[in-house]
């Protein structure tokens, strides 16, 4: 079974022209070893839109395109797969998807956790953070700040700086191997452990070899990051 990627708004990969899609389906149908099954219709570009109203507008635009696609190719009874963590609550209500392929919800990250769930209240999508980068305080030589050993080489910053877990403190700056935490009350001491919630979970995982798995504050396993260093 093969799926055709439909460019539903990300302008990244896939086909948008129905004529080109039909030609590809026809080509697939000439082959005995593969079968056309449906469409990959994932719009990753809308998943991190912070404003709820704008995110909803973009979801509706995306799903309207997919709805037209389903109508045009209804004779093939295509399966439509898509949806992402940032917009899943809006996308599933549009009733155009047959399969939900969300993934980041399992880990979450600082940026996903900051998304407003609706336009009335300032709350977030209801998944807890499960991915943390463990850092150590290595310097407190400057008053009202602490320096930890986790910077650009430990976390991806394309979606913003990490947040500090279990402390009312703010990670404010970083370099290759150092991170600066604003610590107005000088709470942190040398060698203190600080858990950081990365701004973007996916590319952060790619920087590490192992997940250290904890349950009830006890390490129970080590999981290798099997895609470590892969760019595909």
List where the protein language model places each region.
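Active-site loop/helix belt of alpha/beta enzymes
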Residues: 7-121
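Catalytic-face loop-and-helix region of soluble metabolic enzyme cores
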Residues: 4
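A short catalytic or substrate-binding loop motif that flags glycine-/basic-rich loops and adjacent residues
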Residues: 82, 128-131, 173
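Active-site loop ensemble at the mouth of alpha/beta enzyme cores that anchors a bound cofactor
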Residues: 87-167
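C-terminal accessory subdomain/extension
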Residues: 140-232
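Glycine-rich, flexible loop/turn motifs
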Residues: 11, 137, 219
């Amino acid at each position: 079974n093969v799926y055709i990627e439909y460019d539903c708004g990300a302008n990244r990969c896939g086909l948008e022209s129905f004529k080109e899609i039909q030609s590809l389906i026809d080509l697939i149908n000439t082959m005995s070893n593969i079968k056309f099954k449906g469409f990959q219709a994932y719009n990753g570009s809308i998943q991190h839109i912070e404003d709820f109203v704008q995110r909803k507008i973009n979801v509706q635009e995306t799903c309207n395109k997919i709805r037209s696609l389903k109508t045009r190719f209804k004779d093939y009874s295509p399966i439509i797969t898509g949806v992402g963590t940032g917009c899943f609550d809006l996308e599933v209500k549009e009733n155009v998807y047959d399969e939900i392929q969300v993934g980041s919800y399992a880990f979450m990250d600082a940026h996903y956790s900051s998304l407003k769930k609706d336009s009335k209240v300032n709350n977030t999508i209801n998944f807890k953070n499960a991915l943390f980068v463990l850092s150590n305080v290595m310097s407190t030589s400057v008053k009202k700040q602490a320096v930890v050993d986790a910077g650009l080489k430990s976390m991806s910053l394309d979606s913003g700086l990490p947040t500090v877990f279990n402390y009312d403190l703010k990670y404010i700056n970083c370099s290759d191997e150092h991170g600066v935490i604003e610590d107005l009350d000088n709470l942190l001491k040398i060698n203190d452990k600080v858990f950081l919630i990365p701004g973007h979970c996916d590319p952060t995982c790619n920087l590490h070899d192992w997940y250290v798995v904890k349950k009830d504050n006890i390490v129970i396993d080590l999981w290798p990051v099997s895609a470590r260093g892969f760019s595909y």
